[in-house]
């Protein structure tokens, strides 16, 4: 049901997305992970077998290495822009990454955890977004506050003044809650495919790469190995990158 909710949300079939999310949320087998009482430490992770909101894990973390304990270097660090989205009272701020800005949501060793999950909080986020587009943005904010109650120490409740404000707050909460879980690319496609700019440094030289608004490059190419196995498949048309 959660995958179906995600799929229909991506297709902008909002009533179906809501209905499938309802089925997940109404299943009393799962509960949102309460970070107030979780007792997580620097040696434990949000994605763990005792997390009551996780329904299914997949994709071994060996494919998703964040960093190795034998090294002081991380594959990537949490950006200042992401960090700025979290208030000081937000318990996710000390749960989703460590003091060195290394992602800390799941284990970085290939023997301890899976790297991807289906979990209850996504159902709330999917339903909240669908509710905004169904004209029920006040109910969407209620769903967001249900998540925030389990994540934030004080003053967890937010409000919205209109539909647009509610949608922005739903998307912001989605970015907070699902960071590092491979949702962002699909979310950006659904949010109008905005322009992206990234500066990369290599050997002292800096180069800025720009993904224009609405670019065909928002669709990733079909891997060469797949195309070689099935000659009928035609690759995605993408502009040349400079």
Model-derived segments and spans:
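Extended, hydrophobic/aromatic-rich amphipathic alpha-helical segments that build helical scaffolds
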Residues: 1-24, 56, 115-144, 167-176
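Secretory-pathway/luminal and periplasmic proteins that interact with or process carbohydrate-rich
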Residues: 9-10, 27-34, 152-156
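Hydrophobic-face positions in mid-chain alpha helices that act as interaction patches
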Residues: 18-121, 167, 177, 182, ...
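Long mid-to-C-terminal scaffolding/interaction modules that assemble large complexes
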Residues: 131, 208-210
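A cross-kingdom marker of C-terminal helix-rich interaction/assembly modules
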Residues: 142, 147-149, 222, 229
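Conserved catalytic neighborhood of penicillin-recognizing serine enzymes
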Residues: 149-176, 180
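Non-catalytic C-terminal accessory modules of carbohydrate-active enzymes
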Residues: 203-207
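Short, low-complexity, Pro/Ser/Thr/Gly-rich segments in the mature regions of secreted, periplasmic
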Residues: 224-242
């Amino acid at each position: 049901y959660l995958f179906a909710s995600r799929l229909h949300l991506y297709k902008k079939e909002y009533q179906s997305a809501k209905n499938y999310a309802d089925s997940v949320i109404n299943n009393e087998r799962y509960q949102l992970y309460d970070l107030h009482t979780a007792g997580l430490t620097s040696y434990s992770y949000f994605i763990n077998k005792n997390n009551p909101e996780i329904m299914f894990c997949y994709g071994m973390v060996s494919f998703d290495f964040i960093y190795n304990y034998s090294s002081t270097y991380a594959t990537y660090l949490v950006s200042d822009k992401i960090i700025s989205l979290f208030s000081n009272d937000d318990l996710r701020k000390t749960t989703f990454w460590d003091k060195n800005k290394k992602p800390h949501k799941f284990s970085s060793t290939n023997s301890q955890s899976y790297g991807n999950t289906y979990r209850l909080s996504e159902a709330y986020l999917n339903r909240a977004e669908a509710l905004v587009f169904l004209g029920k943005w006040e109910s969407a904010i209620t769903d967001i506050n249900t998540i925030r109650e389990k994540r934030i120490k004080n003053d967890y409740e937010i409000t919205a003044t209109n539909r647009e404000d509610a949608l922005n707050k739903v998307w912001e909460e989605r970015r907070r809650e699902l960071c590092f879980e491979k949702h962002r690319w699909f979310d950006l496609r659904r949010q109008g495919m905005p322009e992206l700019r990234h500066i990369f440094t290599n050997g002292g030289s800096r180069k800025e790469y720009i993904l224009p608004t609405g670019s065909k490059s928002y669709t990733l190419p079909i891997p060469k190995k797949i195309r070689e196995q099935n000659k009928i498949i035609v690759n995605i048309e993408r502009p040349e990158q400079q």
